[in-house]
């Protein structure tokens, strides 16, 4: 409450009334203020409160003093409140009803409702900050309250100087931001050229490039991303977009699929693709639609949906018979396997390992033991 100062309650030039509400009690933090119930007025520049009985008792606080605010729901026998957190009182603050306060926030208690609309309008004003764009052109005089103070002198020249300094600082920040952006674009071009050079070396096998180096180069390329991702801006939003996207996915995913045993969960594909696309993020719906037309475009990839609903992307050469045979061979060699153990053997995710084991079980090659220790698969000897 020590942030409030006395005022005559009149709006200044360039100051506009936003909303007012009667039946509002002030709280100094958690304590009721010594002032009675009154009306609260929100303008483009200030928050004012006038005593309901003694109209000469009027106080105000600039909106620039507000840090943030929040709603407090009504309870049994309690009115709804708006809690307003404030900056410390400035040294040159005009006199007000409180000289000192142990709280850094106030509460507006709405006895006659209206807090929802008031909160909405307060949110709008704090977002727009119109007091910065249209400063009052006259000093805000103090009123004739119980402790009326002197008239506060606000210089027009001082306000204009501050606005000019703020404008120059904003221009400087924008210029620095564009300089950083230009440098980033230059580096991006260098990275794209480097990625193309590495791709050509891998393709042509020029020079002394070992298999380990080839794998490392591929991982670097993947981390650097796609140089020219397919977007709706470049290919529209219809079928043509999904066709071009499917072709790009076919080129991008073939190498990662081969390294992961020929199959990847669609969620893993989604993360991999969006990480490579950088800022041009792909929606889950577009990814699914592109994957659905792999077969019609005769691409080397296929979208597969297991009985459990799990969706995966797999190589066309990755046949169901090979998956079943691999599961049966590994389970037979170990005697029995859980999905976690099978995943470690093949370097797959636990989800895909479980789907392979369930597929082999469905075809009659494996059987399960579902106990408190978990699901374990055995060779089907029957």
Swiss-Prot record:
It is found in: Cytoplasm; Endosome. InterPro entries: GLUE_dom (IPR021648), PH-like_dom_sf (IPR011993), Snf8/Vps36 (IPR040608), Vps36 (IPR037855), WH-like_DNA-bd_sf (IPR036388), WH_DNA-bd_sf (IPR036390). One of its GO terms (molecular function) is ubiquitin binding. Residues 105-138 form the GLUE C-terminal domain. The keyword Cytoplasm applies. One of its GO terms (biological process) is protein transport to vacuole involved in ubiquitin-dependent protein catabolic process via the multivesicular body sorting pathway. Residues 1-88 form the GLUE N-terminal domain. Component of the endosomal sorting complex required for transport II (ESCRT-II), composed of SNF8, VPS25 and VPS36. Belongs to the VPS36 family. Component of the ESCRT-II complex (endosomal sorting complex required for transport II), which is required for multivesicular body (MVB) formation and sorting of endosomal cargo proteins into MVBs. The MVB pathway mediates delivery of transmembrane proteins into the lumen of the lysosome for degradation. The ESCRT-II complex is probably involved in the recruitment of the ESCRT-III complex. This is Vacuolar protein-sorting-associated protein 36. It comes from Danio rerio. The gene is vps36.
């Amino acid at each position: 409450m020590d942030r409030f100062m006395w005022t005559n309650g009149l709006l200044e030039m360039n100051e506009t009334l936003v909303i007012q509400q009667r039946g509002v009690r002030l709280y100094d933090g958690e304590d009721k203020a010594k002032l009675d119930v009154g009306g609260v007025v929100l303008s483009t520049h200030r928050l004012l409160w006038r005593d309901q009985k003694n109209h000469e008792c009027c106080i105000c606080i600039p909106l620039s003093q507000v840090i943030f605010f929040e709603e407090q729901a009504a309870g049994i026998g309690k009115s709804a409140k708006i809690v307003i957190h404030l900056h410390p009182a400035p040294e040159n603050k005009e006199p007000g009803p409180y000289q000192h306060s142990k709280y850094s926030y106030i509460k507006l208690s709405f006895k006659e409702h209206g807090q929802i609309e008031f909160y909405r309008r307060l949110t709008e004003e704090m977002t727009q900050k119109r007091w910065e764009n249209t400063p009052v052109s006259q000093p805000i005089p103090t009123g004739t309250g119980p402790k009326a103070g002197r008239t506060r002198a606000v210089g027009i020249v001082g306000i204009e100087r501050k606005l000019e300094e703020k404008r120059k600082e904003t221009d400087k920040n924008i210029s620095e931001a564009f300089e950083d952006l230009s440098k980033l674009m230059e580096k991006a071009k260098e990275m794209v050229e480097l990625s193309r050079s590495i791709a050509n070396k891998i393709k042509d096998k020029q020079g002394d490039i070992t298999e380990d180096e080839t794998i490392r180069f591929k991982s670097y390329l993947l981390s650097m991303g796609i140089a020219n991702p397919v977007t709706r801006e470049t290919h529209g939003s219809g079928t043509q977009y999904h066709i071009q996207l499917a072709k790009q996915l076919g080129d991008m995913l073939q190498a990662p699929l081969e390294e992961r045993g020929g199959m990847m969960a669609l969620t893993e594909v989604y993360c991999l693709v969006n990480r490579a696309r950088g800022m041009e993020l792909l929606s889950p719906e577009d990814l699914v639609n592109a994957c659905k037309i792999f077969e019609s475009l005769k691409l080397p990839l296929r979208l597969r949906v297991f009985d459990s609903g799990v969706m995966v992307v797999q190589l066309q050469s990755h046949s169901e018979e090979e998956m079943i045979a691999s599961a049966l061979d590994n389970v037979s060699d170990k005697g029995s396997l859980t999905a976690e153990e099978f995943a470690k053997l093949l370097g797959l995710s636990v989800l895909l390992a479980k789907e392979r084991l369930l597929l082999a079980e469905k075809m009659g090659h494996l059987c399960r033991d579902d106990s408190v220790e978990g699901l374990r698969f055995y060779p089907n000897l029957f």
